[in-house]
Amino acid sequence: MFDTKALQAEQRQRASEISLHDGIDNQSVRFIAGADVGFEQHGEITRAAIAILRYPSLALVEYQVARVATSLPYIPGLLSFREYPALLAAWAQLQQRPDLILVDGQGIAHPRRLGVASHFGLLVDVPTIGVAKSRLCGDFLPLHQDVGAVQPLFDNDEQLGWVWRSKIRCNPLFISPGHRVSVGSALAWVQRCMAGYRLPEPTRWADAIASNRPQFQRWLRKNPDFLGKRRDMI
């Protein structure tokens, strides 16, 4: 049995340690990571992929995949505790550490201001941004259908991030700072990482690698000697 109240209290404590001041600028960033987490075997195994891209070319230079035994059942609002062990396992394998991480999930756009992007960013002390495909909390005004349409995401008077339509005829992305990135800069960094798809390149690659999608399989056939590892800790 898990102590939900204790985990929520830990979230509030860790959220108080989050910095929303920019720890990077456009000149200092050389490598950007994308991170994605999924589950296998009916949730018994957690799988995390981290892709490292060179900036600003957005060329893939390294990837790591880790699979670990899932330590926590799904509990709404506590997903980061379920996901971060696999992320840390993949992180430990990296040869090239990034200057910025885009995480598939929430940053501070979370009821207790600690989504997986914030939690992971705090643990590794690297600037992070949450790039989520759906809203967890907050409100926003109606969003135009045009590409590039954007609205701020608010919870009462607090701006948590942005709702941004990155591609026509696609649902918007919910972008929020994770750690050591400001609300204002979070959207700009995601926009710099786009290449015509709904998702920014770092998380698009992480998703493709984690799920072994055809995009990644084709790329592997062309780059058979590329640096990449899969680590199982089960």
From Swiss-Prot:
Sequence positions that bind Mg(2+): D36, D104
Marked site positions, Interaction with target DNA: Y74
Gene3D superfamilies in the cross-refs: archaeoglobus fulgidus dsm 4304 superfamily
One GO-annotated biological process of the protein: DNA repair
Cited InterPro entries: Endonuclease-V
Catalytic activity field: Endonucleolytic cleavage at apurinic or apyrimidinic sites to products with a 5'-phosphate
Short name of one Pfam family: Endonuclease_5
Secreted is among the record's keywords: no
GO molecular function, one term: deoxyribonuclease V activity
GO CC field: cytoplasm
Top-level division of the source organism's lineage: Bacteria
Main location: cytoplasm
Compartments, record wording: Cytoplasm
Keywords from the UniProt entry: Cytoplasm, DNA damage, DNA repair, Endonuclease, Hydrolase, Magnesium, Metal-binding, Nuclease
Necessary cofactors: Mg(2+)
E.C. designation(s): 3.1.21.7
NCBIfam families: PRK11617.1 (NF008629)
HAMAP family registered for this protein in UniProt: Endonuclease_5
Biological function: DNA repair enzyme involved in the repair of deaminated bases. Selectively cleaves double-stranded DNA at the second phosphodiester bond 3' to a deoxyinosine leaving behind the intact lesion on the nicked DNA.
Family membership: Belongs to the endonuclease V family.
Protein name listed in UniProt: Endonuclease V
The organism's taxonomic lineage, starting at the top: Bacteria, Pseudomonadati, Pseudomonadota, Gammaproteobacteria, Enterobacterales
Encoding gene, per UniProt annotation: nfi
